[in-house]
């Protein structure tokens, strides 16, 4: 990971209209290998320091030590794909620092999550999980108004699970917290037409606009300018 390239990319995303930059030093793609805290910090530290004055910065990590250093460096949101399960110190850190927290649903871990995931009703199960994690976070002292929820599109879910979550996203609104959705370039898009990740812009736009229409509050995307334009046009059409 080249910090200079990451900083330049972050600055370009801000220029395109990004309001939050999510910085991570450990891949959470299916099959990704774990990275130790020292290496993770080496990757993200300079990037956060350079970008924190230009936009709101989120640190994508499940390690409390990495999150603490990132917050010291200027990040103000912790995006934890394990929903506070990965490190026993994470909940207390987030409570003590009074920062925003994103809690995401994931079955297993990035190395195992796509190994034949099975649900009875994926929406009901994801909703129950997020409700339980929200309760735990609040019980640990994290202010409820600082918590955002992410159903984890593509994390331990089949193509049909992802589509079902997007169709019924409105059912998660009853949890009472902002919803974060990330569909950008994900494999469920390619499963529709066989497109590689580099050719999934159309599917990213379609799924992002539909997610927003169903109640998503925050969209995590690679193609900020294009998705932003699509959202503005959709808003204009809908009045």
Question: Predicted segment positions?
Answer:
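Catalytic domains of carbohydrate-active enzymes, especially glycoside hydrolases
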Residues: 8-24, 214
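Active-site-adjacent loop and "lid" segments of alpha/beta metabolic enzymes
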Residues: 1-9, 28-56, 61-65, 71-72, ...
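Short, flexible segments with low predicted structural confidence
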Residues: 23, 144, 182-183
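Phosphate/pyrophosphate-binding loops at sites that engage ATP/ADP/AMP, CoA/4′-phosphopantetheine
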Residues: 14-15, 55, 133-146
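Short strand-loop junctions, especially beta-strand C-caps/beta-turns
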Residues: 152-154
